[in-house]
């Protein structure tokens, strides 16, 4: 998954529930897109929608301002070379891509997006605008934050639902039709396997892992002796690497997925 964690249910189970609630078709996003950052995730999602002859794309966002999203996307397309030049300059300061993107957008048009659903929503619109896809984007207001612990009626964030499920708190059933006979697997259950792999691999081998940025292999080696998954992620997280980025790379290490010749990043 995009957040670098395992899905709590397989595709067929989730598809079945969607169909029960009136969805006509459900498409599975390729692994190469589903486990990437927002811009690549969105590219894959919109491409899949186009191939399915979808002409309206509906998504949730916190600000619910689709006109602003189109304005930003069109500005980036018109000033693409300058935009990426500014992004590269910001990245050299040792900050994450998301933060660099925020700063550049504020410079270019005086607006930026910082909330999780807004960021993904912008990437959907960017994919539509950049490729001139015949798709209309429509936004729905998110009433609960992506990581929020608060609930609104029967609506809760994905993060909060996952927390309830893994705490074996049956209150999760108020917010999702999913039911579990046994506890879903979690990536932290595989931390010892991850440690063995990192300890066995040399720096050059780690560099070949998909999404492994320059210097990250040394960071992994430095902190691999930490006893818990949470401690390792916290130690590796910085201004440059978000926790989600670290988790995604950990997933690729576990699956031993190497960088392709045509990188998606």
Mark where each language-model region is.
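Short, charge-rich amphipathic segments
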Residues: 11-14, 18, 59-60, 161
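A glycine-rich helix N-cap at a beta->alpha junction
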Residues: 20-30
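A broad, low-specificity signal for short, low-complexity segments enriched in glycine/proline
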Residues: 17-21, 211-212
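Active-site cores that bind ATP or allylic diphosphates and position pyrophosphate for catalysis
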Residues: 29-265
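N-terminal catalytic cores of NTP/NDP-binding nucleotidyl/phosphoryl-transfer enzymes
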Residues: 1-14, 20
């Amino acid at each position: 998954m995009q957040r670098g964690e395992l899905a709590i249910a397989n595709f067929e189970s989730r598809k079945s529930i969607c169909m029960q609630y009136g969805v006509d078709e459900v498409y599975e996003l390729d692994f190469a897109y589903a486990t990437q950052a927002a811009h690549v995730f969105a590219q894959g999602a919109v491409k899949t929608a186009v191939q399915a002859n979808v002409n309206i794309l509906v998504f949730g966002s916190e600000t619910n301002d689709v006109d602003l999203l189109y304005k930003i996307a069109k500005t980036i397309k018109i000033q693409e070379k300058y935009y990426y030049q500014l992004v590269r300059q910001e990245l050299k300061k040792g900050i994450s891509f998301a933060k660099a993107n925020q700063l550049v957008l504020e410079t270019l048009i005086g607006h930026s997006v910082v909330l999780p659903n807004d960021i993904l929503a912008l990437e959907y619109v960017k994919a539509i605008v950049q490729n001139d896809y015949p798709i209309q984007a429509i936004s729905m207001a998110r009433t609960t934050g992506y990581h929020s612990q608060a609930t609104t009626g029967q609506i809760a964030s994905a993060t909060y639902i996952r927390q309830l499920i893994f705490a074996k708190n049956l209150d999760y059933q108020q917010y999702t039709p999913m039911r579990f006979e046994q506890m879903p697997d979690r990536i932290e259950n595989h931390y010892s396997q991850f440690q063995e792999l990192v300890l066995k691999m040399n720096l050059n081998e780690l560099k070949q892992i998909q999404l492994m940025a320059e210097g990250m292999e040394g960071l992994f080696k430095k902190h691999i002796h930490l006893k818990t998954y949470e401690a390792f992620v916290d130690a590796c997280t910085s201004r440059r690497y978000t926790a989600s980025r670290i988790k995604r790379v950990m997933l690729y290490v576990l699956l031993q997925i190497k960088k392709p010749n045509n990188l998606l990043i």
